[in-house]
Swiss-Prot record:
Keyword Transcription belongs to the record: no
InterPro entries, sorted: PsdUridine_synth_cat_dom_sf, PsdUridine_synth_TruA, PsdUridine_synth_TruA_a/b_dom, PsdUridine_synth_TruA_C, TruA/RsuA/RluB/E/F_N
Family as reported in the entry's similarity comment: Belongs to the tRNA pseudouridine synthase TruA family.
UniProt source species: Colwellia psychrerythraea (strain 34H / ATCC BAA-681) (Vibrio psychroerythus)
Active site residues of this protein: D51
Name listed for the protein in its UniProt record: tRNA pseudouridine synthase A
Pfam families: PseudoU_synth_1
GO molecular function: RNA binding; tRNA pseudouridine(38-40) synthase activity
Described function: Formation of pseudouridine at positions 38, 39 and 40 in the anticodon stem and loop of transfer RNAs.
Keywords, sorted A to Z: Isomerase, tRNA processing
EC number: 5.4.99.12
NCBIfam families per the UniProt record, alphabetical: hisT_truA
Amino acid sequence: MRYALGIEYDGKNYCGWQRQNNVITVQEKLEKALSKIADEKIEVVCAGRTDTGVNATNQVIHFDTEKKRKDTAWTLGVNTHLPSDVAVAWVKKVDDDFHARFSATARNYRYIIYNKPLRSAILSHGISHCHFALDENLMQQGADYLLGKHDFTSFRTVHCQSHSAVRTIKHCRVTRQGDYLVVDIKANAFLHHMVRNVVGSLMRVGQSQETPHWMKEVLLAKNRCVAGVTAPPEGLYFVDVDYPENFELPKSRLGPLFL
């Protein structure tokens, strides 16, 4: 039997999603909790691996098991074995042809910037802070140059292992909600650090250090050195995954928080 789960987590205390030796990861914690409920070793596959410090409000995973359990065992039961910063949000039994990664048609991230001169004590993590005033309209103009299918070499880390840097951005929206700027970006897939490098570059535009057209110049350069700095991980959230409708997976509120 194959199950899909919706997972949310605060990435502050984890060295990313993927299981690794000698460090704490989200995948490790989830597999241990699932294995206790199933009373057998469980391995999971996720829709998109997140880096150290990155959060998720709707990561999607799948796993296989021959053990029959009530749905509440895979939600409430698993949550009792998870730390407070990782939680199962929903469960659905799926056909064997469902694959959390390969069945996905798009991934959606949101980056949250607290844009005030002084930092917040209450929201000391889970957001990024920029004390310089940011113009969301200029940032949106710059973001529009990224829409469509392009080579995003300029926006990936030099350590990116993907064979191709070509990706298709379906939307990239910059909006302000009070003191918060939200960069909402959806693509068929993302390169290593791609979202954070895009945001770091857009922040230069938002501060009028560069014109919106500069984003197109960076894109065409295909050179990581010409783009902006990598934005911090704590403001980044994996918020949604698109799948073909026939899988009928639950849809959660994108979030995070009140957004």
